[in-house]
Structure formats: C-alpha cells, structure tokens
Swiss-Prot record:
GN (gene name): ihfB
Function: This protein is one of the two subunits of integration host factor, a specific DNA-binding protein that functions in genetic recombination as well as in transcriptional and translational control.
Naturally occurring in which organism (per UniProt): Bradyrhizobium diazoefficiens (strain JCM 10833 / BCRC 13528 / IAM 13628 / NBRC 14792 / USDA 110)
GO cellular component terms, A-Z: chromosome; cytosol
GO biological process: DNA recombination; regulation of DNA-templated transcription; regulation of translation
Matching HAMAP family: IHF_beta
Comp. bias (Basic and acidic residues): 82-101
Identification of the protein by name: Integration host factor subunit beta
Amino acid sequence: MIKSELVQRIAEHNPHLYQRDVENIVNAILEEIVAALARGDRVELRGFGAFSVKHRPARAGRNPRTGAHVPVDQKSVPFFKTGKEMRERLNRDHPDPGAAD
C-alpha cells in the first residue's frame, strides 16, 4: 500500500472528512515523525510501534566488483520496532506457514 491508497482508505472509512483533509493530516503526522527523529527523539505509538534513530559507525567496506576497499562514513538510520499488539495481531491473523499443524 502506498500513501495515496492509505489516504483513500481512511477517507472511505470516514465519509465526513474530505480526502484532501485526510491527506493533509497524514502528511502532518509523517512530517512530525521525521522532525522528531531528526531532533534525536524517539516516537512511540502505543500498540503500533516505536520509531528511533540508530547510529552506524564508520567502517571499511569493499567494492564487490573490483574488490577495492572503500571507507564508509558513519551514518544515522531510521529504525522501527513493532509494538506488542501489532506483533500479536499479525501472528494471530497470519500463523507461521512452517509450523506443524
């Protein structure tokens, strides 16, 4: 699902809201999450999950084509950890196909 499909679904489930308003709300929520992460804050949505930033140290990489060693700078990457309720719902709705019956 892409963002426009999410906006459309929310608008369909909430006919009292205009689709443009839903789009503005979704954009505002996503922008606030990004801004909080950029400030170094953790964003927790109870039952859904938590967004945070992980810091990866600089390291020595390798070009797979040439084999040459390449320095890789340190960087910050977004990280999402699912909440307990989400994990339980996903596992309840989609049991492990490899598990014995």
